[in-house]
Amino acid sequence: MNAPAKFSTSQIRSDFLAFFEGKGHTIVPSAPLVPGNDPTLLFTNSGMVQFKDVFLGAEKRSYVRAADVQRCLRAGGKHNDLDSVGYTARHHTFFEMLGNWSFGDYFKKDAIAWAWELLTQVWKLPADRLLVTVYHTDEEAFELWRDMIGIPESRIVRIGDNKGAPYASDNFWQMADTGPCGPCTEIFFDHGDHIAGGPPGSPDEDGDRFIEIWNLVFMQFDRQPDGTLVPLPAPCVDTGMGLERLAAILQHVHTNYEIDVFQALIGKASALTGIADLENKSLRVIADHIRACSFLIVDGVLPSNEGRGYVLRRIIRRALRHGWMLGVRQLFFSKMVPTLVELMGEAYPELVVAQETVARALLAEEERFAETLDAGMKIFDDVASRSQEIIPGADAFRLYDTYGFPVDLTADIARERGMRVDMEGFEFAMERQRETARAAGKFGGGVALPADLVATMAPTVFLGYEAQDADALKVVALLKQGRPVDRAEAGDEVIVFTDRTPFYAESGGQVGDSGQLSGTDISIEVADTQKFAGQFHGHVGRIAEGTLKLGDVLSGGIDVQRRGKTILNHSATHLLHAALREVLGTHVQQKGSLVAPDRLRFDFSHFQPITAEELAVIERKVNAEVRTNHSVEVHNMAMQEALDFGAMALFGEKYGERVRVLKMGGYSTELCGGTHVSRTGDIGLFKITSEGGVSSGVRRIEAVTGQGALDYVAEEERRLGEAASLFGGNSTEIVDKVRALTDRQKRLERELESLKAKLASGATADLGASAVDVAGVKVIAVRLEGFDAKALREAMDRLKQQLGDSVIVLAGAAGGKVALVAGVNGSPTGKVKAGELLGHIASQIGGKGGGRPDLAQGGGEDGPALATALQGVPSWVKQHLG
């Protein structure tokens, strides 16, 4: 039997795409790991995710044949391989999936023929090492393999419904309980009889001898709610082939970790950790996890405590813990990035572009976890030593909450020691924390439109892009105390819904408009405008006069000055977003915003505090775009057209088929439904007022614009002038004067410390003579006025040197409080413990304390009890000396 040719991982990628491009397929770039079209999915976990809407008929593409290499992730949610990574031959968090697709074009014959051609003619796999499976009733596929390809029937395995229900089979694919589905045929490679395991469908199929390399799915049915299968008018093909396991076969190795990409990463991990054993499981974990972490960051995910960011944090910390297991105490994980870029940068240019961002984000997380990893491991060791086989849930939660140990990391460590985590107890502790958070966050229930009322209403027509007031606004719904009513009287608090309105309803961070609604003998003061059910503008306010009824026709006008200030801030957030991405990196994404008349607040993803220099550059760039006075263009277009136009969409936002694009010169292009200036120059001035952290991985900038910015600068100048006058100078001299004052203060503090030391030395010089001899040990217990804990410790050191074998208690009294220091020196150390002695004294004066056998400190209340406690020290020492 001839050995198959060897192919590098890069060559396999190139061969696959070139082969199918030659068969008329459009080569489609990999979609990000964060799905853009499926909010129910945490990560892209298969090649078909980016084509899901095409298969469902919700999206049309310009091609009917496609091929791609899709990056995928399985860590978190239903598809989670994290616990197995590093311990098995083929489990990974990150992997690449080769796929070719037909959307109503070719079907089984071509899909099977091309798969066979690529495997046996391009990659030269021996035909006698390949075996296929088909769904047990798919005669067409069976006959194509037997008659067209020429595979013996003995190497074609029929797989039935092996999962307990009709069409529940390894060889029948379905997207959901209803919808597109169909049989599939899988191609397996036989590693040889020296490897344990049987063919698919046999009792030993879970062995490693026969490895699935390619799955060809034939979507030819539409499954109905009653379970019947209706033929699709245009059947489709969806194929998937794991690159890593294919590379293992084409490189003559048995496990995925032996392929070229992983060997290079494991080699780098070996060099960084000093571990020479390249089969070490921890090195495998590190090599796997650097790929997952890096590509998650490339696709806009940063470490945080929720959602996708928390999955990333878990993967990073699992890798760091495996480094810790290998004895690594220095920072190492981020140093893996250059090697990864060398290996995969050509296939994924976006990795090259984001290299610095990836390394910085990993380093920041590495530094953060390094602060608690060692302490957390000591806690785990202590808990494990007290437990039998189970780590209590409360302790697992403490490791999570205090030391940043994700529970699956704790479970991973426990499993290595033959233990497990009490997950029920952990979830109980987590739920208690959630309940506490929910209780703290409650401030009153919101108002919702009843479903039967929504069914009778048309979406509100918003007039506010062009108009600030409007007539003929018909009242279509009216809420009072959260309930629908037909009429309301003067003094009532109401929410008024009209068929049209110039009032902007709060959304996209922009606050709702306020203003006035009026009609014949009716006046309504509108304090706010909120959006209900995503499409109805509710005017929240109070009837000032008259009676309001359903069907009334009103006129409405917004508070023009308030809206005017708000739009300055909203337009400024777009310029700020663009400046942040330019200065900090394209990993920056909006995480939240508030656009109010008096200020703007912008939350964004970033992994470390912004320096003063970076803030200054960001502010200058925004103001430069303001001065350029770009025209602000608004375009309404289809979503895909908008993305092609260069518009930036926000992760997690749901957009309709048609979207509104806001373009500010060539600097900022975003999807936005808010109200804005007509030219950037209208903003006038942009001034950052604060920057800080909101949560892990999320920063916040607050700023003001226009007259608000001018007022802020004027107030800052006033304060600066006031401060300068206090120093007896002007604002240009204040820095020098403050520096001189600070230097003088430091000098005086040093002089004060020196004087205190001299005072303490003088006060304690004669104390040695007052020592009481107790069984050959000198005992001193005295009160020293005005001594703090530091002065007491210095006095203790001098007395120990002076007295030799001794037991010393010093009490420093000041302001009604007492600082205590106890020391044991020389021969009595084994029998008299300073911590016990200090605790004995502190308990008598309403205090507490403790420490080492030779030195302890504490405190308590000053009073008559102190003298009694100190007088009793010699007898206490005598008792303990025996």
UniProtKB/Swiss-Prot annotation:
Keywords: Aminoacyl-tRNA synthetase, ATP-binding, Cytoplasm, Ligase, Metal-binding, Nucleotide-binding, Protein biosynthesis, RNA-binding, tRNA-binding, Zinc. Its main location: cytoplasm. SMART domains: tRNA_SAD (SM00863). It is found in: Cytoplasm. GO terms for molecular function: alanine-tRNA ligase activity; aminoacyl-tRNA deacylase activity; ATP binding; tRNA binding; zinc ion binding. Its cofactor is Zn(2+). It catalyses: tRNA(Ala) + L-alanine + ATP = L-alanyl-tRNA(Ala) + AMP + diphosphate. This is Alanine--tRNA ligase.
